[in-house]
């Protein structure tokens, strides 16, 4: 991995589908990286995307060098972002995808590591928590250098919904979704704040605000992907923007707190699972996992989410051996 003193950052994107190309487009528009290589099985389509992106250089904030990549380009990459894999179909849960995508990932990670890659993996493909942990196993890299998108998008969705409800900017709402990026995720209402005011206190400002509305807000967040998939076939803009946010935090050594899928080694009383939790992200990847206090009900829900992921990951990895 390159050091922070070097001027040129390189991101390699593997998987030029809707999520991957949206990520590439957002990277260029925000000027986050100087180099971007795109690898995809459909080389012609990927080359078309490269051409299309390069034609917009004159309008970008910085001149990102974009090219059709190969696995050898991973050797000098700071980040390899994997967006490849089977898509989630209507009526299919993220966990239903695990067997399809685990096999795809084993081949991809082997090819990346054979290049001499020594950077950070950023995983977007679902089920993201399970595949993030699989990449740790397949790559042999230390866990702090393998990061999943986790519940970064879910947290952004929650802040958006709360912002709409309270007529406030989502940037001033500090509330997290943690757990599986999926059906067992949970909101941390007990520690959520608006500005510096506890969310549950803020509710008392008006009789038009109710705790029952919070349940509806969370349901909207949890089920958002299903609704979007039903209407347009896939989600990609929101997750692409969340991936760019994590990429920026890494490349700029920000030490920002994001709810990535991170490997727990005793935090929250849990071992050996990747799951969405507030995490300090910097140039080295995961710097620290923040242990947010939970009430009894939240802890119970979180433990259920952990067990759900373990119940899928462990038998699936046994099948891969």
From Swiss-Prot:
Pfam families named among the record's database cross-references: Ldh_1_C, Ldh_1_N
Positions with a binding annotation for substrate: 88, 94, 126-129, 154-157, 235
Disulfide bonds, paired cysteine numbers: none
UniProt key word Signal: no
Activity control summary: Allosterically activated by fructose 1,6-bisphosphate (FBP).
Gene3D superfamilies from the UniProt entry: Lactate dehydrogenase/glycoside hydrolase, family 4, C-terminal, NAD(P)-binding Rossmann-like Domain
Subunit relationships: Homotetramer.
GO biological process, one term: glycolytic process
Catalytic activity: (S)-lactate + NAD(+) = pyruvate + NADH + H(+)
Keyword entries, A-Z: Allosteric enzyme, Cytoplasm, NAD, Oxidoreductase, Phosphoprotein
Binding site for NAD(+): 19, 40, 45, 71, 85-86, 124-126, 149
Catalytic site: 181 (proton acceptor)
Family assignment from sequence similarity: Belongs to the LDH/MDH superfamily. LDH family.
Name recorded for this polypeptide: L-lactate dehydrogenase
Native organism: Oceanobacillus iheyensis (strain DSM 14371 / CIP 107618 / JCM 11309 / KCTC 3954 / HTE831)
Any one Gene Ontology molecular-function term assigned to this protein's record: L-lactate dehydrogenase activity
Annotated beta-D-fructose 1,6-bisphosphate binding sites: 159, 174
InterPro entries assigned: L-lactate/malate_DH, L-lactate_DH, L-lactate_DH_AS, Lactate/malate_DH_C, Lactate/malate_DH_N, Lactate_DH/Glyco_Ohase_4_C, NAD(P)-bd_dom_sf
Function: Catalyzes the conversion of lactate to pyruvate.
EC number(s) per entry: 1.1.1.27
Phosphotyrosine sites (modified residues): 226
